[in-house]
């Protein structure tokens, strides 16, 4: 059974205004984050941005880093590298699991 939209991390539920209110940022900041593709929210049929809970957590990180004086382009690079690291870690873990399945049990 599929999770309900309220339970789904990737369900595009929140408008730009709602996210701006939640995070105490300006809507223009969120639009800039989108323009730089730090996050890329889906669009409603009417073209309105719709953010997922996952994207909101990423934006919270962006706000924290921006408050520390890091530029949005640098933040985008940091997030890209974090995502690449997570992917490589998943691949490594899968390869380790497959290798362990091929090796004989220690005696």
Task: Describe each region flagged by the PLM.
Residues 1-64:
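Basic helix-turn-helix/winged-helix DNA-binding cores
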Residues 65-107:
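Long, leucine- and charge-enriched amphipathic alpha-helices
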């Amino acid at each position: 059974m599929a999770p309900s939209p309220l339970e789904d991390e990737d369900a595009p539920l929140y408008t730009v205004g709602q996210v701006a209110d939640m995070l105490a940022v300006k809507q223009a900041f969120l639009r800039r984050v989108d323009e730089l593709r730090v996050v890329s929210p889906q669009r409603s049929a009417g073209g309105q941005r719709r953010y997922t809970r996952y994207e909101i957590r990423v934006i919270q990180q962006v706000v924290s880093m921006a408050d520390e004086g890091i530029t949005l382009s640098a933040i985008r690079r940091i997030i890209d590298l974090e995502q690449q690291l997570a992917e490589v870690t998943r691949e490594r873990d899968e390869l380790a699991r497959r290798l362990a399945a091929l090796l004989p049990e220690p005696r």
